[in-house]
């Protein structure tokens, strides 16, 4: 399965509008770049050929097919390790990982990977929320990761003590990338598959459900996902724009979740709620 990148130039003033236009795209696959002193905005969307071709047809721009070398950009300088609540560290190169005093709590994701490295507000907040709850989870707890992307949340769940993790994504490209990352991190408890977030009948019930999905898909898939959440389990969600968080929280509460605790970072929101 090949990865493609759609690119378009715009202005910084249009950033919010572009977030809304691209609301149906996994937020981990959307990168918006600005430069100091410039009012320009560069938009990148990573995905399959059909997705990027549709964007090109609807909005112009250009589409490029990415080689594996470009996708992971292994020539990029490694960044400093990212610490998550002092319980996880995300490394960008094997040399840095080798020096970690707690390798069992360390995650390797290559520097320059196109998406899903833990830098995006949606992923970073999910990781923090997961770190916060895991000390109090029952022994042998399990997780379901909906919209896994690069697999970072599933890998984090195993590193934090999950006995089993099921992770899926609708995009086969994401599953290919996540399989490579799971292998690189020597994870043995993660089962990956291509699946639709609105058709989750095959998955087992879990103590934690992670859903890094755009708001419309999150609302549509929540009834099925919550059926997979055990009583007293935790639902962690992200990928929601600040302008849409009230609607998402209302939908989740109508399905029986407690009022979510919401964390806002810039334009993005994440939340956590418990199932009674």
Question: Which residues make up each language-model segment?
Answer:
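N-terminal auxiliary segments of SAM/dcSAM-dependent transferases
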Residues: 2-100
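A short helix-to-beta-strand connector/capping loop
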Residues: 61-62, 86, 103, 163, ...
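Active-site-adjacent beta-strand anchor residues
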Residues: 8, 45, 116, 168, ...
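Conserved SAM/SAH cofactor-binding pocket of Class I
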Residues: 113, 117-197, 201-202
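Nucleotide donor/acceptor-binding cores
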Residues: 105, 140-141, 233
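S-adenosylmethionine
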Residues: 132, 136, 170-276
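Alpha-helical structural signal in soluble globular domains
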Residues: 41, 58, 156, 160, ...
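SAM-dependent Rossmann-like transferase core, predominantly class I methyltransferases
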Residues: 74-137
